[in-house]
Amino acid sequence: MGVKTILYQEDARKALERGMDILAEAVSVTLGPKGRNVVLEKKFGTPQIVNDGVTIAKEINLQDTLENTGVSLIRQAASKTNDVAGDGTTTATVLAYAIIKQGMRNVAAGANPIVLKRGIEKATQFVVRKIMDYARPIENLTDITQVAQISAGNDAEVGSLIANAIDKVGREGLISLEESKSTATELEITEGMGFDRGFISGYFVTNTERMEVVLDNPYILLTDKKITVVKQDLVPTLELVSKTNQPLLIISDNVEKEALATLIVNKLRGILNVVAVRAPGFGDRRKAILQDLAVLTGGDVITADAGLSLERMDIENLGVARRVVVGKENTTIISDSNKQEVLARCEQLRRQMETSDSTYEKEKLQERLAKLTGGVAVIKVGAATETEMKDRKLRLEDAVNATKAAVEEGIVPGGGTTLIHIAAELLEWVKETLTGDELLGGLIVEKALQAPLKKIALNAGENGSIIVERIKESDFEIGYNAATNEIVDMYEAGIIDPAKVTRSTLQNAASIASMILTTECIIVDKNKETK
């Protein structure tokens, strides 16, 4: 075990703060319509130009281990928000930083960190309740276009593309991003289906940055069996597919240890690009979903019921797809063949729904039907250079996530406006309800809620404090349009944020900030010179 450096109390918090200053400064320059870009040097290939908070946060690694711990902690606020809402990562970082900065000042002045934390949590819960109260449900395609446009950095083309995609595949539909061969970004609707199961092992991952497996033109093995005996269950399929030089997706009940090890070895040695996924659902429903997948991919479900076995099967029994994307928790299959078979299967499901008496059964059939008929909207991202392509893809991804979040929980005025208006209500509530250091915690949150708008204004070259005061005196819908430097009705101007993103940014920022404020000791490796 290496030698450790141990810091206590104020020294510990100060060391963390130094790292946070660096990360917050680098990330916050991208906030708002006039936010700047950040260039990331890559070990291989061209540098990447990005405007995405979480991507920048993931790249920052400092030499000083103590400072780096601070970076890692505040990075969690961005990562957590990205996992929950898929957008709002820069705002989460700015909020977390604002709460921590003020909190540390209060702790240094003698406030009790535990009581302070309680105050921060109570104030956060109040704000979250208010956000949900003010949220307006998505009513039309224009709302969707505006949410997507704002999230993609004010790109009108992206806004209408995503709105069209959701219009075509429905609110529950799948949207996939691909790199285009041309410079144009276009939308294509294909046959496809997704389900909530991810890869069995991280060794299958092909894209470590996004932690996902992408297979082009794969064969697909569908079975309701457990794959246990390597020689009988696996080898015949692996031999068939390895001759074709195409990847393989296995969807089965489970893959036992020895069989999984065989697949991983084949993958790591480059013999076969393969990924294994557990089949969705249980019992008869699982068999039915596998049958849906078989119709979509033109394959057979290898099951004893149909007299098929893994030992004696042919390449014709395997399904095929144009593309498969497997994440930690989801799998998307994009196929563009078998249109007639899919339509026939949908008709069959509709007839089953008509004859079924059980409400539960009808719901499940409706779910399957929606997945089959919805298809997948594939947005082919085009750009003149690879650097622009990567930046555009990140913006599109944010926009897709933000739009889905907006559909889920509704929309609120964007540009930090909602937080400013709720801050005024929070101030009254905190003064009436909280006392002592809890009151201080509430006031910290009230002040931190102003930070995103101040930063947006600062990035636009304006005085943030003056803008905040002007917004405070206005109605709830009124906010600051940094693109035109005007005070406007945010709904009319189309500057809106998903309530889910606004809520998640504050919840994650407050959670990380509370943990850091209650830190009394840091233990890190003494492998580098620490200050």
Swiss-Prot record:
Domain of life of the native organism: Eukaryota
GO biological process, one term: protein refolding
EC number, UniProt record: 5.6.1.7
Annotated GO MF terms: ATP binding; ATP-dependent protein folding chaperone; isomerase activity; unfolded protein binding
Location in the cell: Plastid, Chloroplast
InterPro entries found in the cross-reference section: Chaperonin_Cpn60_CS (IPR018370), Cpn60/GroEL (IPR001844), Cpn60/GroEL/TCP-1 (IPR002423), GroEL-like_apical_dom_sf (IPR027409), GROEL-like_equatorial_sf (IPR027413), TCP-1-like_intermed_sf (IPR027410)
Record flagged with keyword DNA damage: no
Binding residues annotated for ATP, in chain numbering: T30, L31, G32, P33, D87, G88, T89, T90, T91, G415, N481, A482, A483, D497
Catalysed reactions listed for this entry: ATP + H2O + a folded polypeptide = ADP + phosphate + an unfolded polypeptide
One GO location term (cellular component): chloroplast
Entry-linked Pfam families: Cpn60_TCP1
Family: Belongs to the chaperonin (HSP60) family.
Subunit comment: Forms a cylinder of 14 subunits composed of two heptameric rings stacked back-to-back. Interacts with the co-chaperonin GroES.
Job of this protein: Together with its co-chaperonin GroES, plays an essential role in assisting protein folding. The GroEL-GroES system forms a nano-cage that allows encapsulation of the non-native substrate proteins and provides a physical environment optimized to promote and accelerate protein folding.
Matching PANTHER family: 60 KDA HEAT SHOCK PROTEIN, MITOCHONDRIAL
Name this protein carries in UniProt: Chaperonin GroEL, chloroplastic
Native source organism of the sequence: Emiliania huxleyi (Coccolithophore)
